[in-house]
Swiss-Prot record:
This is Ribosomal protein L11 methyltransferase. Gene3D superfamilies: Vaccinia Virus protein VP39 (3.40.50.150). GO terms for cellular component: cytosol. CDD domains: AdoMet_MTases. It comes from Mannheimia succiniciproducens (strain KCTC 0769BP / MBEL55E). Belongs to the methyltransferase superfamily. PrmA family. The gene is prmA. InterPro entries: Ribosomal_L11_MeTrfase_PrmA, Ribosomal_PrmA_MeTrfase, SAM-dependent_MTases_sf.
Amino acid sequence: MAWVQIRLNSTNEKAETISDYLEEIGSVSVTFMDSQDTPIFEPLPGETRLWGNTDVIALFDAETDMQQIVRLLRQEGHLDENTAYKIEQIEDKDWEREWMDNFHPMQFGKRLWICPSWREVPDPNAVNVMLDPGLAFGTGTHPTTALCLEWLDGLDLAGKTVIDFGCGSGILAIAALKLGAKEAIGIDIDPQAILASRNNAEQNGVADRLKLYLSEDKPANMKAEVVVANILAGPLKELYPVISELVKEKGNLGLSGILATQAESVCEAYQAKFDLDAVVEREEWCRITGKLK
């Protein structure tokens, strides 16, 4: 089935109202895109943040009279003479197949591979984690996830417990188990993350060694030899008392989700209790690791 798309330049204040109206007049989907390549960081739980200059992109059936759509947008005040817009035909494709073709097995460190379930494992003798993009907040493609996976691959995890604080998809906890950890514990504020982690652990045959808790339900006095938290700089600093208490004496801590420009402030929050290693940067992101003093 072919489609036609309209792209409107808007603002964060107007974008959601325009989106609602486009759906009312027949759009089958509406998405938002940054029109100026401006990053957004640290939305609050349940919050949708938009860019100052936001493009609203609506998809319609190819038979739609797009001039009528433009007229309706003008009548409702969503489109004026100063609003840039573009209408274009969208080639019909097997979108599911194209999406799947974009994901390939990825290697992290010396031993670890993350592989989509529909792909053949490149090295059956390696440590292979099968994980599909989708529900999961982290599949190895983001630099912060990659930095954490490489760090875990470089540790001796045999017989140790690993806590994945802000577990999302569970990718870090599952990787730790496959790399030899005795037990892993995933903690998150989002019930959907707990569900995703459980499903991914079952797919990888490690569900019996993974304990999962919502943040408010985690047991008191929980500690582990290795703690990894791939969240964001603000929460990492705010939750320093909580995260630092999870690390056993002489235990290892790995932090990411941090912009390189934020590394200094995060290091300042943790350096009193941890001997920190050199910050490792990738693209605009970084990883901070250290040992509890």
